[in-house]
């Protein structure tokens, strides 16, 4: 009898313990079921909170037509946000946008996509685990990335394949490692890249299709 009671007691402990094991989505995470819109000329400060995409937005794979977790409108700023997995299609920008200290723990379809012409500045933050590209540029723009760390991706920046519009890419004070293809890939003969004060290693061909390149004070390691 004592043996049976002991077995039942241990079974109860195991069952109770298993109920309190954390899932991949932690209690402090904010699960986003509908894209968060950052309105024109406003600032969204996530205060370091971690956001993950609900199934309504997408599964974070390379499947096309997933929705973003954040849509940032012209003149707006998104800052102090952590994007966990799944991140669906990350962040979409529409116009002149500032992205400050945003971290992508596991890039989904893309970390960020430029959807409308403008000046996009990414200052601080990091991104990793991108099976294809980290940043996707779909419209003519000036695209600046500074004080950023990127690791383990296909490409750091990709201009829309087959497009000929003009893009100016500016990379400053970044650390870029383990890109399978390149830092920047474009099919446009007019697009430019300017990279300064940046450390990089194992980045594939470095530049693919880029015909206008300026580099200064960079370190390969």
From Swiss-Prot:
Record organism: Bacillus subtilis (strain 168)
Source organism phylogeny: Bacteria, Bacillati, Bacillota, Bacilli, Bacillales
Subcellular locations according to the entry: Secreted
Recorded family membership: Belongs to the polysaccharide lyase 3 family.
Any Pfam family: Pectate_lyase
Known pathway: Glycan metabolism; pectin degradation; 2-dehydro-3-deoxy-D-gluconate from pectin: step 2/5
Cofactor: Ca(2+)
Reactions this protein catalyses: Eliminative cleavage of (1->4)-alpha-D-galacturonan to give oligosaccharides with 4-deoxy-alpha-D-galact-4-enuronosyl groups at their non-reducing ends; Eliminative cleavage of (1->4)-alpha-D-galacturonan methyl ester to give oligosaccharides with 4-deoxy-6-O-methyl-alpha-D-galact-4-enuronosyl groups at their non-reducing ends
InterPro entries attached to this UniProt entry: Pectate_lyase_PlyH/PlyE-like, Pectin_lyas_fold, Pectin_lyase_fold/virulence
pH influence on activity: Optimum pH is 10.
Miscellaneous comment as given in the Swiss-Prot or TrEMBL entry: Hg(2+) could replace calcium ion.
Residues annotated as signal peptide: 1-27
Record text on cofactor binding: Binds 1 Ca(2+) ion per subunit.
One biological process term in Gene Ontology: pectin catabolic process
Keyword Cell cycle attributed: no
GO molecular function, one term: metal ion binding
Domain of life according to the entry: Bacteria
Function comment: Catalyzes the depolymerization of both polygalacturonate and pectins of methyl esterification degree from 22 to 89%, with an endo mode of action. In contrast to the majority of pectate lyases, displays high activity on highly methylated pectins. Is also able to cleave trigalacturonate to galacturonic acid and unsaturated digalacturonate.
Protein keywords: Calcium, Lyase, Metal-binding, Secreted, Signal
Enzyme class: lyase
PANTHER family in the cross-refs: PECTATE LYASE F-RELATED (PTHR33407:SF9)
Temperature dependence: Optimum temperature is 65 degrees Celsius. Thermostable at 50 degrees Celsius in buffers at pH 7.
Protein name: Pectate lyase C
Known EC number: 4.2.2.2, 4.2.2.10
A GO-annotated cellular component: extracellular region
């Amino acid at each position: 009898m004592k043996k049976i009671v002991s077995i039942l007691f241990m079974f109860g402990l195991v069952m109770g313990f298993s109920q309190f094991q954390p899932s991949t989505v932690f209690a402090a995470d904010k699960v986003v079921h509908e894209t968060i819109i950052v309105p024109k000329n406003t600032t969204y400060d996530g205060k370091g909170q971690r956001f993950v995409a609900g199934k309504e937005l997408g599964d974070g794979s390379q499947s096309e037509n997933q929705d973003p977790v954040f849509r940032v409108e012209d003149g707006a700023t998104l800052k102090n946000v952590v994007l966990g997995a799944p991140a669906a299609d990350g962040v979409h920008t529409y116009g002149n946008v500032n992205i400050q200290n945003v971290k992508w723990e596991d890039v989904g379809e893309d970390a960020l996509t430029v959807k409308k012409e403008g000046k996009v500045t990414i200052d601080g933050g990091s991104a990793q685990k991108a099976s294809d590209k980290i940043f996707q540029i779909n419209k003519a723009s000036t695209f600046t990335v500074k004080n950023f760390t990127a690791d383990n991706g296909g490409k750091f920046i990709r201009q829309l394949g087959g497009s000929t519009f003009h893009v100016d890419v500016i990379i400053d004070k970044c650390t870029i490692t383990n890109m399978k293809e390149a830092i920047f890939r474009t099919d446009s003969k007019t697009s430019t890249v300017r990279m300064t004060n940046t450390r990089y290693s194992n980045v594939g061909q470095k530049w693919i299709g880029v015909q206008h390149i300026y580099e200064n004070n960079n370190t390969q390691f």
